[in-house]
């Protein structure tokens, strides 16, 4: 910080003397409550500007997080700036913040980091091995009353070194002039910001006068120059080499490369800390103009910071005494190389030495993350210097799920340039932790109340914001060196979501975000011509449900320096200065005096050998003097000045020689001829002290009070000067004329003035707050003022959770943190606000006697406990608002207790035996029922089970809305919901909502009744008349197997009918079931669904639905099949049918009349061939054939009329067919059809029907004697027939007939089995057996749809069956023909 009155640098220790010609602005960490930017201006020797050491305030090292969503955790870094003059760019290096914000209760605290270079040794040295080294000027603390124009301004006096002269003869005056033109240098080259005063001296700071970035520097007259002690040897000017040559081997250097932990926190961070490069370089005299040497640095090093234009800061090396350029710099940043090319300076001077002192930086691009043992190296000439460091980046600022980090990554500032003030870039990492955030918003603001001179700005006219999405799992560079090619540019997605606001801010609405983002803010500086502008920019991330978090960055300035000098010979000179303290010694802050005449005489001849007039800075130089003794005389002193004492101290270069003195030149320059003069002035002041015993007298052990403001006024009350007391309580007003003055002391905070004019010693007493001082030809150092500390006390104690609600602090009860406590005065004005710490403690400090009001804010979810319980006010609760009195001691009795109110929710689960949905007196609870409690978002909170009485309860619940779910107990059904008007007696169902509002809720009940069970069953009877109805004379069939399947087809029960044909399945729930009756051996399924549901047959498989009642309607009937021989004849007919022959055969069938009908059927047979469609017709025919036929037809139905053919063969036959059907009951489906039956044939097999066919053996039927033969055949026939049946499918009718003949054969079941094979054939044409029906929930039978059944029977069986069938047909056909005749 620049103290503009005294122009002194303020460090953490207070005032320091001006020490280093180096311009720097230091970096500070900024707190959340207030931000101070401290800047220290120091001017450097060389024209090179070293960037500021990157440092953060270690004292402010912890991110502050707030307790509410509208408060944020701020973290701001003060990044160092390198401010240039009005036409130059600022050199800035960013500082990533350590995590720190700190606020103090007694105002804004500024803590300054150490300067990058802070010793008096940072200057160019010129020396040879033969030199008589001159002592450098002594640095002493400036008198605090001295007003300075430049802070930290060192008396500019380089070390002067000796060189032997090349020429030993005394030069002529003309020669002297020539040498002067070449070698005289009386100005200083200082590269820094331009600072102007009323008196200005122009100093060239760069050899390239056309470079607008290297503007001239104007130093005020008050700046003391370096003593021009440089002793140079004039070299014969030699032509420079025609060819540039690398002279690294002719350069020797003594180099140190040091890692500087700027904030001394033992953590090295590229953006905070830096490298100090110091080197003393000696140039061999063989080096010529145009030769060059190099400085090579490793890829972990960078030579400039944030400002790309700052590369010039490590630039040309100049002689600070005369401004001449020694070597010019050229940068090759791509190869990390600086090339220095020598000018003709090295041709004209011997033994050139150069010193460089640079601050260089760690390159975050090559150090993206924390890493140990990172190497940094610099090679000057052929000498490499190395060092290593453990790099440790700071963490991001995190608060709950919010996380953020930021840094300035580029700044170009043109101070004083209205048209192009420059720009800066800030890089912000949003949500680097990659948490899922809701309603995430980023606010960027170039404003902070503690920085009224902030030159940052954000608005839509000058600001460009880029937004990049970071891939999941991507590692961001912790030095904020971002490779955007590896990220996704999503700027266009957010163009409409960026809102610019007042006060230089912009808000970006990210919405719901679960990835990290990089936001780059590129904006312009505001115009400024301030010598110490500040740049502060904040970034705050907020999201729903999380506390906001903030970070920020700020900047400061500094310079690098370099320089060199050759050595020249034989000059006399130095300096005339104003010795303000009249001690005869040159000291810092004492300025030169111009226009004083200096005349030099040869002391032996009294001949005048030179004359000069001091320049504005007080310097002079008279060159080209040979060895000898010379008399130096000063004249033409400014009016009113007197000569200071001579020969003071032991340093001839700093003392005064008086108006006339004799000095000797002996093989080297003599630059010690100085003169000190002063204008008589007087001082007024003394001391401000702490009067600890309050007696009004300065006692020996009482100490001064620093920082007290003292104001000097003239007799008319006009303010002349204002100072503050130093660390010892001293103050002084200087440069005062004789007269009367008024002195006023400002009472320091926390103090009270002591008594006035106690005792008789005016130098020891207190003059009070206002006094008069007189100066009369002498200093007046008697004006003192004493103060004693105003007594201060504390008030506070404790906020605790009163778990037992008794209003008293128990030993097991703990404090509540984060409770806001407010202190007010008696008038109700807020004095202080604080929050309880982690232990519930709070305290207000620094309070005077008085009455105060203390208010406690009730923490969320708590209720204040009872007040004033018991007699011990140290442990009771004072409530949420109370009064506290301080009377000469602390008051630590003001406490407040709170408790968390919690409630219960629950009631009862009961068995509602009467199912009325209301708890009746005699109904009991159900134990073991699982009850689940959920919050409004369906998150399970607790689960309990009802106790032995059906009771349940959830405890320790806060106010809110909850969901309660009851699990239906096994064997029960939920009762009706919300019956009646009594909410405490009704059932709330399986799921209900319960609200707790400052009371228990014990109304959530649920009722269940036992789930009823049902029975299913009825009767299996012998349907002797085959009419499909249960007649009173028909009896049940015993031991019929009945199987019960559930809806999934799983067997859940098996039983057998009792001796009366009855069966029953019990304990069934409502639902869908299937009942399967196993057909008794030798019986045939009777017709189904022929009459009322409780009297008919339901078939072999029945689907049934039980809905809240028993079902005793599931019956089934069977009968025994009859046989007929003549049928076999008809079979033969059927043969002819089979021929499908010609219907004429079927005509012959017509003999058997109806057969003829059936013939026609048979015709249809042929149709049947075309397809069993006609068979279906034939069915009807078959019907016509005979009822019994029709039975078989019903078989044949499925069978496609082939049956009907067979029917047509003979009605009875068709019966027999039905026999055979029964065999191939399939036949019953028109036999072979039934062969599809054959599947059922397998029935028929089981029928062994064939046995009954063996009836058909009775086929002996003579009908076909041959039949009977065929019977034996029939066996095979049966097979083959059946097979043929299947063949005959189209014919199958007649086949099936023949089958039916041979059916009996098919009796050989096994054949029939083979039938079933053929059946499979037949199956292709025949319908599935009609034994399965479906019942709806009304218990009405529904016919099942017909489906084909394909069997894998033997093809050979089919073939043989076909052949036998054909043979049988021919025989029968021939026989019938004979009969017809």
Swiss-Prot record:
A motif (LPXTG sorting signal) lies at residues 1344-1348. Residues 130-145, 174-183 have a biased composition (Basic and acidic residues). InterPro entries: Adhesin_Fg-bd_dom_2, Adhesion_dom_sf, Fibrogen-bd_dom1, Ig-like_fold, LPXTG_anchor, Sdr_B, SDR_Ig, YSIRK_signal_dom. Keywords: Calcium, Cell wall, Peptidoglycan-anchor, Repeat, Secreted, Signal. Disulfide bonds: none annotated. Pfam families: Big_8, Gram_pos_anchor, SdrD_B, SdrG_C_C, YSIRK_signal. Residues 54-185, 857-883, 972-992, 1078-1357 are annotated as: Disordered. Its main location: secreted. One of its GO terms (cellular component) is extracellular region. Residues 1-35 form the signal peptide. Residues 36-568 are annotated as: Ligand binding A region. Gene3D superfamilies: 2.60.40.1280, 2.60.40.1290, Immunoglobulins. Residues 569-680, 681-791, 792-901, 902-1012, 1013-1123 form the CNA-B domain. PANTHER family: COLOSSIN-B-RELATED. Cell surface-associated calcium-binding protein which plays an important role in adhesion and pathogenesis. Mediates interactions with components of the extracellular matrix such as host DSG1 to promote bacterial adhesion to host cells. Contributes to the resistance to killing by innate immune components such as neutrophils present in blood and thus attenuates bacterial clearance. Belongs to the serine-aspartate repeat-containing protein (SDr) family. This is Serine-aspartate repeat-containing protein D. The gene is sdrD.
């Amino acid at each position: 910080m620049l103290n503009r009155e005294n122009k002194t640098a303020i460090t953490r220790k207070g005032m320091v003397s001006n020490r280093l010609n180096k311009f720097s602005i230091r970096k500070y960490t900024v707190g959340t409550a207030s931000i101070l930017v401290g800047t220290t201006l120091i001017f450097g020797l060389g024209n090179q500007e070293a960037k500021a050491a990157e440092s953060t305030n270690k004292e402010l090292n912890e991110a502050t997080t707030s307790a509410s969503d509208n408060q944020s955790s701020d973290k701001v870094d003060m990044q160092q700036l390198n401010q240039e003059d009005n036409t130059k760019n600022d050199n800035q290096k960013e500082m990533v913040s350590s995590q720190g914000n700190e606020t103090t209760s007694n105002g804004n605290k500024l803590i300054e980091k150490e300067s990058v270079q802070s010793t008096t040794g940072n200057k160019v040295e010129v020396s040879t091995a033969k030199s008589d080294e001159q002592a450098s000027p002594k640095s002493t603390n400036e008198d605090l009353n001295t007003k300075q124009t430049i802070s930290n301004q060192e008396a500019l006096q380089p070390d002067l070194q000796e060189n032997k002269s090349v020429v030993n003869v005394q030069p002529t005056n003309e020669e002297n002039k020539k040498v002067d033109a070449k070698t005289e240098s009386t100005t200083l080259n200082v590269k820094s910001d331009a600072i102007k005063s009323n008196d200005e001296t122009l100093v060239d700071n760069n050899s390239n006068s056309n470079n607008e970035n290297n503007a001239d520097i104007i130093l005020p007259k008050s700046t003391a120059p370096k003593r021009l002690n440089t002793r140079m040897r004039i070299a014969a000017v030699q032509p420079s080499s025609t060819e540039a040559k690398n002279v690294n081997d002719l350069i020797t250097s003594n180099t140190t490369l040091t890692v500087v932990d700027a904030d001394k926190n033992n953590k090295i961070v590229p953006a905070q800390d830096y490298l100090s490069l110091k080197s003393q370089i000696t140039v061999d005299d063989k080096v010529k103009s145009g030769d060059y040497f190099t400085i090579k640095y490793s890829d972990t090093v960078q030579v400039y910071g944030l400002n790309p234009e700052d590369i010039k800061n490590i630039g040309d090396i100049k002689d600070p005494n005369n401004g001449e350029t020694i070597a010019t710099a050229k940068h090759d940043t791509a190869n990390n190389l600086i090339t220095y090319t020598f000018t003709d300076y090295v041709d004209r001077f011997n033994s050139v030495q150069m010193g460089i002192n640079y601050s260089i930086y760690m390159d975050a691009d090559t150090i993206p993350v924390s890493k140990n043992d990172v190497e940094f190296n610099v090679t000057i000439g052929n000498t490499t210097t190395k060092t290593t460091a453990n790099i440790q980046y700071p963490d991001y600022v995190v608060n709950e799920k919010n996380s953020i980090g930021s840094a300035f990554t580029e700044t170009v500032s043109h101070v004083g340039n209205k048209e192009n003030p420059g720009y800066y870039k800030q890089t912000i990492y949003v949500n680097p932790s990659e948490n899922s955030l809701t309603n995430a918003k980023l606010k960027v603001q170039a404003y902070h109340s503690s920085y009224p001179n902030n030159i940052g700005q954000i608005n839509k006219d000058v600001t460009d914001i880029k937004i990049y999405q970071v891939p999941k799992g991507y590692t961001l560079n912790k030095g904020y060196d971002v490779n955007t090619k590896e990220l996704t540019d999503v700027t266009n997605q957010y163009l409409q979501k960026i809102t610019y606001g007042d006060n230089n801010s912009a808000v970006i609405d990210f919405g719901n975000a679960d990835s990290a983002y990089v936001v780059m803010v590129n904006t312009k500086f505001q115009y400024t011509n301030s010598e110490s502008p500040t740049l502060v920019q904040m970034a705050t991330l907020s999201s729903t449900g999380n506390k906001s978090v903030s970070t920020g960055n700020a900047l400061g300035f500094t310079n690098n320096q370099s320089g060199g000098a050759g050595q020249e010979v034989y000059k006399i000179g130095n300096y005339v200065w104003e010795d303000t303290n009249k001690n005869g010694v040159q000291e810092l802050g004492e300025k030169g005096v111009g226009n004083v005449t200096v005349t030099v005489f040869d002391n032996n001849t009294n001949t005048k050998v030179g004359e000069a007039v001091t320049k504005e800075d007080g310097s002079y130089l008279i060159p080209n003097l040979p060895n000898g003794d010379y008399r130096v005389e000063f004249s033409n002193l400014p009016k009113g000045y007197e000569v200071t004492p001579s020969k003071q101290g032991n340093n001839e270069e700093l003392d005064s020689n008086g108006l006339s003195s004799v000095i000797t030149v002996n093989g080297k320059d003599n630059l010690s001829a100085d003169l000190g003069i002063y204008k008589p002035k007087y001082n007024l002041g003394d001391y401000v002290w702490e009067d600890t015993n309050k007696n009004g007298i300065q006692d020996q052990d009482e100490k001064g009070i620093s920082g007290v403001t003292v104001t000097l006024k003239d007799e008319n009350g006009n303010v002349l000067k204002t100072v503050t007391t130093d660390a010892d309580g001293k103050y002084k007003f200087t440069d005062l004329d004789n007269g009367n003055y008024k002195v006023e002391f400002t009472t320091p905070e926390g103090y009270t003035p002591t008594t006035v004019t106690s005792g008789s010693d005016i130098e020891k007493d207190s003059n009070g707050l206002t006094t008069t001082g007189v100066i009369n030809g002498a200093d007046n150092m008697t004006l003192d003022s004493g103060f004693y500390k105003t007594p201060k006390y504390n008030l506070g104690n404790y906020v605790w959770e009163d778990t037992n609600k008794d209003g008293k602090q128990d030993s097991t009860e703990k404090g509540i943190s984060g409770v806001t406590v407010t202190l007010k005065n008696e008038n109700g004005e807020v004095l202080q606000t604080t929050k309880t710490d982690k232990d519930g403690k709070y305290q207000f400090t620094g309070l005077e006697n008085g009455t105060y009001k203390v208010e406690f804010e009730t923490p969320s979810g708590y209720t204040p406990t009872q007040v004033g319980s018991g007699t011990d006010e140290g442990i009771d609760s004072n409530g949420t608002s109370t009064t506290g009195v301080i009377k000469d001691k602390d008051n630590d009795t003001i406490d407040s207790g709170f408790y968390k109110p919690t409630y219960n929710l629950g009631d009862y689960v009961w068995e509602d035996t009467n199912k009325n949905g209301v708890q009746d007196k005699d109904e009991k609870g159900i134990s073991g029922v699982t009850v689940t409690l959920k919050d409004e978002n369906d998150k399970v909170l607790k689960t309990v089970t009802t106790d032995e009485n059906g009771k349940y309860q959830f405890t320790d619940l806060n106010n809110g809305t909850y969901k309660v779910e009851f699990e239906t107990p096994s064997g029960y059904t939920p009762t009706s919901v919300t019956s009646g008007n009594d909410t405490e007696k009704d059932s709330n169902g399986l799921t209900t909502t319960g609200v707790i509002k400052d009371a228990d809720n014990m109304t959530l009940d649920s009722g269940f009744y036992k789930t009823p069970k049902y029975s299913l069953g009825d009767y299996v009877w012998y349907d002797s008349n085959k009419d499909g109805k249960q007649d009173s004379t028909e009896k049940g069939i015993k031991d019929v197997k009945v199987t019960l399947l559930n809806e999934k087809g799983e067997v859940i029960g098996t039983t057998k009918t009792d001796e009366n044909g009855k069966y029953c399945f019990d304990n069934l729930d409502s639902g869908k079931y299937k009942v399967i009756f196993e057909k008794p051996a030798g019986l045939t399924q009777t017709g189904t669904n022929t009459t009322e549901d409780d009297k008919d047959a339901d078939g072999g498989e029945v689907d049934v639905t039980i809905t809240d009642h028993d079902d005793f309607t599931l019956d089934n009937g069977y009968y025994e099949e009859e046989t007929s021989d003549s049928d076999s004849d008809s079979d033969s007919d059927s043969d002819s049918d089979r021929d499908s022959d010609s219907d004429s055969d079927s005509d012959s069938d017509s003999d058997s009349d109806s057969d003829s009908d059936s013939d026609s059927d048979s015709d249809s047979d042929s149709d049947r061939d075309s397809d069993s469609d006609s068979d279906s017709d034939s069915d009807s025919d078959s019907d016509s054939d005979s009822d019994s036929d029709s039975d078989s037809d019903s078989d044949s139905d499925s069978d496609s009329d082939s049956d009907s053919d067979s029917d047509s063969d003979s009605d009875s036959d068709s019966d027999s067919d039905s026999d055979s059907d029964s065999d191939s009951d399939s036949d019953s489906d028109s036999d072979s059809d039934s062969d599809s039956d054959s599947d059922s044939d397998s029935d028929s097999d089981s029928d062994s029907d064939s046995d009954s066919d063996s009836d058909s053996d009775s086929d002996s039927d003579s009908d076909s004697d041959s039949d009977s033969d065929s019977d034996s055949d029939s066996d095979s026939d049966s097979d083959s027939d059946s097979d043929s049946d299947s063949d005959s499918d189209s014919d199958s009718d007649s086949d099936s007939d023949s089958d039916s003949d041979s059916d009996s054969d098919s009796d050989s079941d096994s054949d029939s089995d083979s039938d079933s094979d053929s059946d499979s054939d037949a199956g292709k044409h025949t319908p599935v057996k009609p034994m399965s029906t479906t019942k709806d929930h009304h218990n009405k039978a529904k016919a099942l749809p017909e489906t084909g059944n394909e069997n894998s029977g033997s093809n050979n069986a089919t073939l043989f069956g076909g052949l036998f069938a054909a043979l049988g047909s021919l025989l029968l056909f021939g026989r019938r023909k004979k009969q017809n005749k």
